[in-house]
Amino acid sequence: MSETTGASYAAAGVDIEAGDRAVELMKEWVKKTQRPEVLGGLGGFAGLFDASALKRYERPLLASATDGVGTKVDIARQLGVYDTIGHDLVAMVMDDIVVCGAEPLFMTDYICVGKVHPERVAAIVKGIAEGCVLAGCALVGGETAEHPGLLGPDDFDVAGAGTGVVEAERLLGPDRIRTGDAVIAMAASGLHSNGYSLVRHVLLNQAGLSLDAEIAELGRTLGAELLEPTKIYSLDCLALTRTTEVHAFSHVTGGGLAANLARVIPDTLHATVDRSTWTPAPIFDLVGTTGQVERLELEKTLNMGVGMIAIVPQESADVALTTLADRGVEAWVAGEITDRADHTTGAELVGDYARA
């Protein structure tokens, strides 16, 4: 009688050895993110962070956020470039946390793949680790899940969760904002990580453009433009809180500039942002003109060139701009805070964009 071979995890499409190989490849990158408070190494059941380090706080508040990168991952997949998408993930998570004035402490990641390609997974984690360094936080753990049959062998998605801390009396938000405050815009590095479903639909599906196509107005290939990593503002925002008074931050993500700014404006006040104070990068015009997308639709989908907003007292604006300039962050006064009066929303864009 011949011996039969039963079912196995490997036969079902899950390669544990490939997963182990990926962990070995990513270890050196994870080590580079470590802070003094982190205990243990990669491979434990849980990441450990020594909370006694928070004793210096009078009343520490922990801030947490969870996010992903959205359909930008498909651009990375098509280009075969996996080591930048991690920057986007850290930006989406940690720049949400810093909005309340919190210092990023640590984060974890979740990578879901159809098939574990160890080098690809390690490249993704490399990008996450680099992003963590830029945000000043530690990468204390993560999960790589292989889902054969649910995802194609080249498909993947990434998500992450992070934690930060802020002194209770230094918590930023709507209650600090006053009439006359200046609205300072910080330039985006590009599309960042929002609106890619629209961008892909317009440029790739409707217009049939190739990611390898050289686009004159962009000065590089379309793929390079679309994969440009999201700028991470965490340490720049914290530097701002040390050099001048800050009332609030707003991270410009899904929903656009006005909608995200309105999230931090109290019911009695209104933020007016003047479009004439900046010129959006060519990619925004390319999407708009190619897809005949109305300006308001673009503005509620894309960041239009502004990735982070700081609201500061008018008299602090110059110091704030100097601080950001010293850190290499392009920034400008884009508007002001006024009484709500007859305005039905917390924030609006007015005027027309400056021409290049």
Go through the PLM ranges and name each one:
Residues 2-11, 120-138, 151-156, 210, ...:
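Glycine-/charge-enriched secondary-structure boundary and capping motifs
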Residues 2-39:
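N-terminal amphipathic/basic leader segments beginning at the initiator methionine
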Residues 15, 67, 180, 251, ...:
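Residue-level signature of catalytic and energy-coupling elements of molecular machines
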Residues 23, 122-125, 196:
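Hydrophobic face of alpha-helices
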Residues 26, 48-51, 93-94, 199-202, ...:
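Buried hydrophobic packing segments
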Residues 28-189, 352:
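Glycine-rich phosphate/pyrophosphate-binding loop regions near the starts of catalytic domains
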Residues 57-58, 72-73, 193-195, 260-261, ...:
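Short helix/loop capping segments that flank catalytic or ligand/cofactor-binding pockets
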Residues 66, 157, 170-218, 222, ...:
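Short, acidic (Asp/Glu-rich) active-site segment that either coordinates a divalent metal cofactor
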